[in-house]
């Protein structure tokens, strides 16, 4: 088989957002891939603390993980093998902006998500979403970065406020990526990393460490923060539930996350199974847990 690794997004790609773990067909397919010598790479906007609970993956043990949208790549044990943390200036500017307008802001550190602004909003939202691995600690003392710098940030605000940020601080070149859908109170959610950073950079870092090329990789995702890796992988696929920008970046569309699209792709590419294609069924939005929330995540 020409491909050596499968890099899969987590939420609404490997498993439906809000469910406790990947569905059995996906778990079986990933384990079969690994038994045949393929490497499974979890690629996510989450930091390592958001994916380290083995139970949340239904028995899947990833070989590597591209975390924080490419800003930190780790091995199975969580050891960092490549990283691109935020600078002090980038972090302080985000804090100043979100404090001025009372927007929720968290930073993704090695050990946990720390909410530097509007902790209660973030914590309550995570509890409502009930997505395994997602929660934050109260970081409003704003001192965790004195130990080491975060790899990424996460903020909630109306979309027009992102433009206001860029008007004031565009010189920093921070990369904002919307994740999920707009919720009932008009807020959108954004993963934020250094300029030029995305999952494609993380995938390139990992391939270099493994002695592989990007042509050896298959990448699959569903939303804006996946576009970087979808564009650089040897073969790319977007879930049928994916966003228009993700669909525009890929070689092909596969089945919805709720019909085990990743499992079908593995069977096709590694085991000569039928071509993985969407069924055409309308499953509705895969982000219902966010869209129905108001005043919280």
Model-derived segments and their meaning:
Residues 1-5, 23, 193-297:
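Mg2+-dependent phosphoryl-transfer enzymes with acidic/Ser/Thr/Gly-rich catalytic loops
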Residues 21-127:
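Active-site phosphate-binding/coordination module
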Residues 34-35, 99, 170, 231, ...:
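Anion (oxyanion) recognition and catalysis
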Residues 37-41, 62-63, 151-153, 215-216, ...:
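Short active-site oxyanion
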Residues 55-56, 74-76, 166-168, 229-230, ...:
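Short loop/helix-cap segments at secondary-structure boundaries that form the rim of catalytic
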Residues 62-68, 176-178, 236-241, 254-255:
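Short hydrophobic/aromatic-enriched beta-strand-loop microsegments
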Residues 108-220, 224:
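Conserved acidic, metal-coordinating active-site core of Asp-based
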């Amino acid at each position: 088989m020409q491909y050596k690794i499968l890099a899969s997004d987590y939420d609404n790609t490997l498993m439906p957002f809000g469910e406790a773990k990947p569905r059995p067909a996906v778990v079986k397919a990933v384990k079969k891939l690994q038994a045949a010598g393929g490497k499974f790479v979890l690629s996510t906007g989450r930091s390592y603390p958001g994916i380290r609970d083995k139970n949340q993956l239904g028995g899947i043990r990833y070989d590597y993980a591209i975390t924080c949208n490419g800003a930190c790549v780790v091995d199975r044990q969580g050891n960092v093998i490549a990283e691109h943390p935020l600078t002090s200036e980038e972090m302080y500017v985000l804090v100043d902006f979100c404090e001025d307008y009372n927007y929720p802001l968290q930073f993704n550190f090695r050990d946990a998500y720390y909410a530097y602004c509007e902790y209660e909003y973030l914590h309550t939202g995570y509890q409502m979403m009930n997505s395994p691995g997602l929660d934050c600690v109260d970081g409003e003392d704003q001192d965790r970065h004195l130990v080491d710098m975060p790899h990424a940030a996460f903020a909630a605000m109306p979309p027009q406020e992102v433009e206001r940020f860029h008007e004031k601080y565009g010189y920093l070149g921070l990369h904002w990526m919307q994740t999920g859908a707009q919720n009932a109170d008009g807020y959108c959610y954004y993963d934020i990393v250094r300029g030029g950073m995305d999952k494609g950079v993380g995938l390139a870092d990992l391939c270099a460490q493994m002695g592989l090329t990007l042509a050896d990789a298959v990448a699959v995702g569903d939303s804006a923060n996946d576009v970087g890796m979808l564009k650089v992988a040897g073969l790319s696929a977007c879930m049928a539930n994916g966003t228009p920008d993700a669909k525009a970046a890929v070689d092909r569309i596969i089945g919805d996350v709720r019909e085990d699209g990743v499992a079908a792709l593995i069977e096709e590419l590694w085991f000569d199974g039928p071509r993985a294609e969407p069924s055409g069924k309308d499953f509705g939005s895969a982000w219902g847990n966010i869209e129905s929330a108001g005043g919280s995540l």
